Amino acid sequence: ILMKRKLLRVPCYLKELLAMLLCKLLGAVCRAFIPSYRGIWLVGERGTDARDNGYWFYRYLRTQHPELRTYYVITADSPDAAKIAALGGAVQRGSFRHYLLYYCADYLVGTHVQPCAPDLIVHYHLASKGIRARGKQAFLQHGVIMSEMQWMHRENLYLNLFVCGAKPEY
């Protein structure tokens, strides 16, 4: 059964690898020749909502630092899409633009591991093989997990910043 599940994921992994290669290459070209593809902050939560620390951080960036190139990853049919549209910089989750910005971004900020990834599960597994986005990754933890920290020490967990809610967590 486990092998069958893994085999069912193969097309998904292949699609992500192809998109990754294309967008990494195109992203490098865009960053080299188009200034608007540099200094990108990509923020998100699950990609379907804007209600947690990711939204409030994004709102802060858009209102207090409008000079930054900030984008928020969200689905068009999300009940929270209007909030992001009002702030500007909405990026449709899973779109070509999402992939391109993901691989161009200098900062990937989110409330989940593999922040802003087009496919969280696939990108988590690809990261375990050393294949990941170029941007620095920040995890805006929601809630207090203090004693549930084992998962934070996995080899494929690449975080440059872990924002926590309580002193014992760091």
Feature map (PLM): residue ranges:
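Active-site and donor-binding regions of nucleotide-sugar-utilizing enzymes
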Residues: 39-170
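Membrane-proximal basic amphipathic "stem/tether" segments
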Residues: 1-40, 47
